Regions:
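A SIS-like phosphosugar-recognition module
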Residues: 1-168
Length: 168
């Protein structure tokens, strides 16, 4: 998990289709750091490249890479139980990741076995969306504490703003 350079976020409820953009902004802006709280260069990987999308639309774009590719990644699958078909589809995809198909005789059809984190919402309400946002914000800040970085400054972003002002 800690060595993975990317984090895949796939949601299986169309109403959450933009959640990956929120997660990208929160995590990458907060934890994209190379200097720790003691002003020392870190000697380990911090942050992660966040990517993903809406599951039913994503299956033919990047799921091949997930199942048979060579890159390791953290995988999060999010769905509400209220969307029954998509919930079953998500469950099947996670099951396929965990169990694989090592008994397949044709080696080129075999898939990698890997884990995934399933975030299951009872329904999609303002309360449950708030819980999901809070979960992601807490995950982000705890990673920052673990890496000893400051999640609340974004000097890389600020430099771009300063240089834009100079151009005006």
């Amino acid at each position: 998990l800690l060595d993975a350079q990317t984090t895949l976020l796939v949601n299986y409820d169309y109403r959450l289709r933009n959640f990956v953009k929120f997660a990208q902004q929160v995590e990458m802006e907060s934890n994209g750091k190379s200097i720790d709280r003691n002003d020392k260069k870190v000697e380990y990987q911090t942050g992660s490249i966040i990517w993903g999308g809406y599951g039913p639309e994503s299956q033919h774009s990047f799921f091949q890479h997930i199942f048979q590719g060579t890159k390791d990644m953290n995988k999060y699958f999010i769905c509400s139980k209220s969307d029954k078909l998509n919930f079953k589809q998500m469950t099947a995809q996670i099951e396929s990741l965990i169990e694989g198909n090592e008994e397949e005789k044709d080696i080129h059809k075999r898939t990698n076995i890997s884990g995934a984190t399933k975030v299951e919402l009872k329904d999609l309400s303002p309360y449950s969306i708030g819980q999901l946002i809070s979960l992601w914000e807490n995950k982000t800040i705890f990673n920052s504490i673990f890496w000893n970085t400051n999640a609340f400054d974004q000097w890389g972003v600020e430099l771009g703003k300063i240089n834009t002002q100079k151009q005006l």
